[in-house]
Amino acid sequence: MFDVKAWAVYIVEWAAKDPYGFLTTVILVLTPLFIISAALSWKLAKMIETREREQKKKRKRQENIVKAKRAKKD
C-alpha cells in the first residue's frame, strides 16, 4: 500500500538537500496547470460576456415589444 508518511518524508528530504532542483521541478509541474487555468478562465469570461449581451438584447427586444403594444392600444 502507498505510505503517505514515507512519501512526505522523502519530499521534505529532497527539498532540504536540493532546494533549487525541488523548486525547479515544482515550477515545471505547476506552469502548465496555471496556463490551462488562465485559458479556461479567459474562455469562461468570454462565455459570460456573450450570455450577458444576449440577455440584454432579449430584454431590450421584449421592452420594445411591450412599448409597441402599448402604443398600438393608444
Curated annotation (Swiss-Prot):
Protein name, per record: Small integral membrane protein 15
Gene: SMIM15
Entry membrane topology: Single-pass membrane protein
Compartments, as annotated in UniProt: Membrane
Taxonomy, superkingdom: Eukaryota
Coiled coil: 48-74
Region (Disordered): 53-74
Residue ranges with Basic residues bias: 56-74
Pfam families: UPF0542
GO cellular component: membrane
Keywords per UniProt: Coiled coil, Membrane, Transmembrane, Transmembrane helix
